[in-house]
Amino acid sequence: VYQVVAIELNNAYPYPFGKVQDLSTVLLEYSDINYPLGINIDIFPIDGLPVDLKKSDKHFLKIKWLMMIMNLKKVKITIKRSFLKNLILLIGKILTLLIPYRFIVCKMSYIAQRYDYEKSDYVSNLSCPDGKHERTSKRVFENSIEILFEGNNFYAPIGYHEWLHNIYGDY
């Protein structure tokens, strides 16, 4: 049995993107987030961006800042890390103690949806932003095509090559 989980469906869900999970499994993650999940795949939303590149970069920066705080809150302090790194993480965790994790996830989602997808010429996955490399023309996602991947056929965005090239370069 599979289940879709997302912040829009469950207030306790701790990520700014959805997942499809297998309810017959249990995923053990080394994190300060205590949310039960089965083995899962991520579902990343594609959100609109402003046409102006400087505004777009500023938009990415807001999301990246929140992502950094979110990651700081969920990372575990461990003896496998140096004392100095653990000390820096601990100070960061103390400084962000009063910021609820859910607030960060909701704020990321709110900011990501600021620009209407339908009215945007450029789009991106803002839930895990890689900055300007993620920015791509909306036409990349307007249709899908079937492609062969490791012996199986899958649907992919019609402009998958442009999208992957923007993110990874010569993939």
What residues fall within each predicted segment?
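Conserved catalytic core of two-metal-ion nucleotidyltransferases
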Residues: 2-51, 56-60, 71-81, 85-169
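Mobile amphipathic helical/loop "lid" adjacent to a hydrophobic cofactor/ligand pocket
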Residues: 66-68
